[in-house]
Amino acid sequence: MKGADAEARAAAWLASLGREVVARNYRIPGGEIDLVSRDGDVLVFTEVRQRHSSRFGTAAESVTPRKLALMRRAALAYLSREHGREDLPCRLEVLTIDGPADRGTLTLLPLDG
C-alpha cells in the first residue's frame, strides 16, 4: 500500500501547513484527484507522486501530460458536482515524495492553468 502511505503522509503535511483536506481519491471515469484541500478560500487539487528511487526517474518526472489533462478534467468535475459551478478559485499542484513514503523528501510543485 505504498501509494496509500504516500497520500496519508502528503495529507498530514498539507494539514500541517494549515490546509483543510476536504476529499481524498476523488474519482470520475477516466480521472482522479488524490487530495482536495482548502487553502483559505482556494480549493487545491493535489496529485501525489512517490518514487522510492530515481532509477526510473524522479517522482515529478512520472507526471505525464496525459495525467495532467485527466487531473484537470477531474478537478472541473469536482467543482461542478460538489459546488455547482466551475469558476471557483482553485489551483492544481503535484506533491512529490522522492524516497520512501514515510521519510522521503517532499516537494510541492504548483501547476499552471
Swiss-Prot record:
Belongs to the UPF0102 family. Gene3D superfamilies: 3.40.1350.10. Pfam families: UPF0102. InterPro entries: Restrct_endonuc-II-like, tRNA_endonuc-like_dom_sf, UPF0102_YraN-like. Signal peptide: none annotated. NCBIfam families: PRK12497.1-3, YraN family protein. GO terms for molecular function: nucleic acid binding. This is UPF0102 protein Dgeo_1894.
